[in-house]
Design a protein with these regions (language model features):
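Short, surface-exposed loop or secondary-structure junction motifs
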Residues: 2-197
Length: 197
């Protein structure tokens, strides 16, 4: 476990798990450093990471936290993360232009992310781990529009309700938008939200 047995969902959501910022982009095979690819390899590498400090005692912004949260959602629900988010979050909120891997008819509306592989990327995740694993991860890869994001924000501002439909309990919104990080940690975080930067 390398000190990971005490990590909780709350630690992952507040970046207080103690895990490193990210997984390595290369692995050593027979003494040679090589690139890797594939979702399963990303999960294997994330699970293999050691903690830098005991969970709950410090803050490290870590993609690994949300990579693992995405995997937990898939394990618990039995659904691919892309399907779960579409069916359980985006469609119920009327966010019709939000998701992973934008379709060709939405790509022209997607803001370019960066120059990579000899061209400006549009509709391709900016994060190298997400790109290597098919574009769907808990920590990166999602695309949306201003209109869809506004719907999500309205739901949060209305304590979990949008257009008369209850999507989240007010207590859930409070946990997201108020300090949930341990008192020993300088960075103030809600569950999945940054509070003070």
């Amino acid at each position: 476990n390398q000190g990971k047995e005490a990590i909780t969902i709350r630690h992952l959501m507040t970046h207080t798990s103690g895990l490193n910022p990210g997984i390595p982009l290369t692995i050593e095979i027979d003494g040679v450093s090589k690139d890797w690819a594939g979702y399963e390899m990303a999960i294997t590498l994330a699970k293999a990471e050691e903690v830098r400090h005991p969970p709950g005692t410090g803050f490290i912004y870590s993609d690994i936290n949300f990579i693992l949260l995405g995997e937990i959602i898939q394990q618990v629900t039995g659904k691919h993360l892309e399907d779960f988010t579409r069916e359980s979050v985006f469609l119920p909120l009327g966010m019709k232009d939000t998701g992973y891997i934008p379709s060709q008819n939405l790509r022209y509306r997607t803001a370019p992310t960066k120059w990579w592989d000899g061209k400006m990327q549009r509709g391709t995740p900016n994060n190298p781990i997400c790109r290597r694993t098919g574009g769907v991860h808990g920590h990166a890869g999602m695309f949306t529009t201003a209109a869809d994001l506004a719907r999500y924000c309205r739901m949060i501002l209305n304590q979990g309700e949008l257009d008369g439909v209850r999507f989240l309990q007010p207590e859930t919104v409070r946990l997201m938008t108020s300090v949930q990080s341990p008192s020993a940690v300088d960075s103030l975080r809600g569950l999945g939200w940054d509070i003070n930067s």
